[in-house]
């Protein structure tokens, strides 16, 4: 058995990735979210596949087909709500995974980090298109509002929007292509995850101290396989609690009304996991400026390695930067809250202040704190 595991071309790759992989001996539970994201992706692909067997991507039947899945298909309600709430669990794990990377300086693995950012954008695009498919009110108007943002691009904007729509409004062509892309993208994401892991295994994992751990490695199996398994059990417990007891708690009631192009909902808003970016978008009273701020709010992650000024890798021994990091987390929670509120006083002002704070903390305060901490520890250049 050992010989097969270590010599067989396929089994060898699996062995070097998940069994005999040398891992740092001190990585905490914050390192569990990579495997949890893998589990989320598998759940989403499987439930999505079964949903696609019954779903029809036509404007006249899409809403009814989702109702049919919930009412008439064996365990259709379970599959549908696992898929919808699975997306929420996916984003919770994503945000915690990225936050871990920021806190412990994992962004110094440049290739792994940059592929991770591309993955984040791709997952966000996939989730957005998936939200359009049930063809409820919020699906339709969400698609209309978000795709319309591209019209802010000078010269080609309007043409580009109509090209994406496949007509002069969000209609049959839009729904069909969104379904096609929503079905295809998870497989592209899977391929990118493999590349993400490939680059990670070139360097090995980071650890909470940020210090090189080559002198103290342990095999991935059984130590981290059992630890990941515990994480998976907790994730599935949380997901199934959500699915079986509070399936609609994270959804919008407006999406239980079939799409009507003649009636606009009072408050158009995306799913909770996009609210922070939506708040940043709305805080700028200019269409193009808002779109640029929206993209910058995620793309700013690509600047993290450049903005790193500290002589230490992570924040474990850097109290000033730690404080700023947790202020940033609180700031993102405020943005998430504001994104779900109507555009009126005092929410507009709070949103603008939180948006300014978000960029200021990342671009100015954290690099400055790094320099101050270097001087406090009397590091010499």
From Swiss-Prot:
Belongs to the cytochrome b family. Its cofactor is heme b. SUPFAM superfamilies: a domain/subunit of cytochrome bc1 complex (Ubiquinol-cytochrome c reductase), Transmembrane di-heme cytochromes. GO terms for biological process: mitochondrial electron transport, ubiquinol to cytochrome c. The gene is MT-CYB. It comes from Neotoma albigula (White-throated woodrat). One of its GO terms (cellular component) is mitochondrial inner membrane. This is Cytochrome b. The chain crosses the membrane at residues 33-53, 77-98, 113-133, 178-198, 226-246, 288-308, 320-340, 347-367. Component of the ubiquinol-cytochrome c reductase complex (complex III or cytochrome b-c1 complex) that is part of the mitochondrial respiratory chain. The b-c1 complex mediates electron transfer from ubiquinol to cytochrome c. Contributes to the generation of a proton gradient across the mitochondrial membrane that is then used for ATP synthesis.
């Amino acid at each position: 058995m050992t010989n097969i595991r270590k010599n067989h071309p396929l089994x060898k790759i699996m062995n070097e990735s998940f069994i005999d992989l040398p891992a740092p001996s001190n990585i905490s539970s914050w390192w569990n979210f990579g495997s949890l994201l893998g589990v989320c992706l598998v759940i989403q692909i499987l439930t999505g596949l079964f949903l696609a067997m019954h779903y029809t991507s036509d404007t006249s039947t899409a809403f009814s087909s989702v109702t049919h899945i919930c009412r008439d298909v064996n365990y259709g309600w379970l599959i549908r709500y696992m898929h919808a709430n699975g997306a929420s669990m996916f984003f919770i794990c994503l945000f915690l995974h990225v936050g871990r990377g920021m806190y412990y300086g994992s962004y110094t693995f440049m290739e792994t980090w940059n592929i991770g950012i591309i993955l984040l954008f791709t997952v966000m695009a996939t989730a957005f298109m998936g939200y359009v498919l049930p063809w409820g009110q919020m699906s339709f108007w969400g698609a209309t509002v978000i795709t319309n943002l591209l019209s802010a691009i000078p010269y080609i904007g309007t043409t580009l929007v109509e090209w994406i729509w496949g007509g002069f409004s969000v209609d049959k062509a839009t729904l069909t292509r969104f379904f096609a892309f929503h079905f295809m993208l998870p497989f592209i994401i899977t391929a990118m995850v493999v590349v993400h892991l490939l680059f990670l295994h070139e360097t090995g994992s980071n650890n909470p101290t940020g210090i090189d751990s080559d002198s103290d490695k342990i095999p991935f199996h059984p130590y981290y396989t059992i630890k990941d398994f515990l994480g998976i059990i907790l994730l599935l417990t949380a997901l199934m609690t959500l699915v079986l007891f509070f399936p609609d708690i994270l959804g919008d009631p407006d999406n239980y009304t079939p799409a009507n192009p003649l009636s606009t909902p009072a408050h158009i808003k995306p799913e909770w996991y996009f609210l922070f970016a939506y708040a940043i978008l709305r805080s700028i009273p200019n269409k193009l400026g808002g779109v640029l701020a929206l993209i910058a709010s995620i793309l700013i992650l690509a600047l993290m390695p450049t903005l790193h000024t500290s002589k230490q890798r992570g924040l474990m021994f850097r109290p000033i930067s730690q404080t700023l990091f947790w202020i940033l987390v609180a700031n993102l929670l405020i943005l998430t809250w504001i994104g779900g509120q109507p555009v009126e006083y005092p929410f507009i002002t709070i949103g603008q202040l939180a948006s300014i704070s978000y960029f200021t903390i990342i671009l100015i305060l954290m690099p400055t704190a790094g320099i101050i901490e270097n001087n406090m520890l009397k590091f010499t250049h």
